């Protein structure tokens, strides 16, 4: 089990950790720091937006693509810590994590509710939380970790909810050790009917619609070369240090 002492290897010295429950720690003084998921539409999101047929029909990809990306990320190195920034409920990736216990993994999210759902998913698959994994209640936009702590950073579906992504990408790059890699997914406009749906969510303030040119212009400005593939309205991205 990754305990507080082990976590101190990667947690910034000025960050205080609070034990919440077995396998879950928080960087906050109490549980009142809530994400929009906690406050608004969590159950609906987990039931609808995580449905594989919904994602295939509307957005043009299979949720199994997340599993494949996560497996590739975990296999990208044989050593070093892994960070999943904004891990959510592990709706798409729990099986990938449950099947890979070689590397130490920090699963970070600002929603304590989502972390508990993620924990329950791992327990359902494995009978317990794998000893190489720990949950941290914290903000992916202000990573509470020492620089260059992680060999692999994963972040699924976080970029498209941010008005500006430069700061988050810089945070991730600062947290990446030499020879490491970042793996990301984000919804984009891609000349499909679902673009209208994306813009509708944009007007509601839930997502920020971008096309591929606008997205990758930010990576280029940060001198972060990327490899990517696009399926429907989803971009699957990797960037090496």
For each feature predicted by the language model, list its residue ranges.
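A conserved beta-strand element that flanks and buttresses the S-adenosyl-L-methionine
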Residues: 154
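A short glycine-rich, Lys/Arg-flanked "PGG" loop and its adjoining helix->strand segment in the class I
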Residues: 166-181
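Core SAM-dependent methyltransferase catalytic element
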Residues: 221-241
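Conserved class I S-adenosyl-L-methionine
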Residues: 6-76, 91, 95, 114, 183-206
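Short catalytic micro-motifs in class I SAM-dependent methyltransferases
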Residues: 157-158
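Class I SAM-dependent methyltransferase SAM/SAH-binding core
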Residues: 81-142
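Short alpha-helix
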Residues: 206-223
């Amino acid at each position: 089990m990754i305990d507080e002492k082990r976590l101190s290897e990667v947690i910034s010295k000025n960050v205080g950790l609070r034990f919440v429950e077995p396998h879950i720690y928080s960087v906050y003084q109490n549980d009142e720091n809530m994400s929009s998921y906690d406050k608004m539409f969590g159950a609906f999101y987990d039931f609808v937006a995580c449905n594989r047929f919904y994602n295939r029909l509307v957005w043009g990809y299979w949720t199994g693509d997340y599993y494949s990306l996560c497996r590739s990320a975990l296999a990208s190195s044989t050593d070093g810590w892994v960070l999943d920034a904004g891990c959510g409920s592990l709706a798409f990736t729990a099986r990938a994590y449950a099947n890979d216990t070689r590397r130490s993994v920090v699963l970070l999210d600002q929603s304590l509710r989502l972390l508990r759902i993620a924990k329950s998913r791992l327990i359902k698959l494995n009978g317990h939380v794998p000893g190489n994994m720990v949950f941290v209640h914290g903000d992916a936009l202000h990573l509470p970790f020492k620089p260059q702590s992680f060999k692999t950073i994963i972040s699924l579906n976080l970029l498209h909810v941010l008005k500006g992504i430069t700061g988050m990408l810089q945070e991730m790059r600062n947290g990446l050790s030499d020879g490491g890699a970042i793996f990301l997914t984000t919804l984009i406009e891609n000349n499909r009917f679902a673009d209208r749906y994306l813009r509708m969510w944009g007007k509601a303030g839930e997502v920020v619609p971008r096309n591929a040119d606008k997205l990758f212009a930010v990576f280029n400005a940060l001198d972060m070369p990327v490899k990517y593939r696009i399926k429907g309205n989803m971009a699957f991205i990797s960037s090496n240090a």
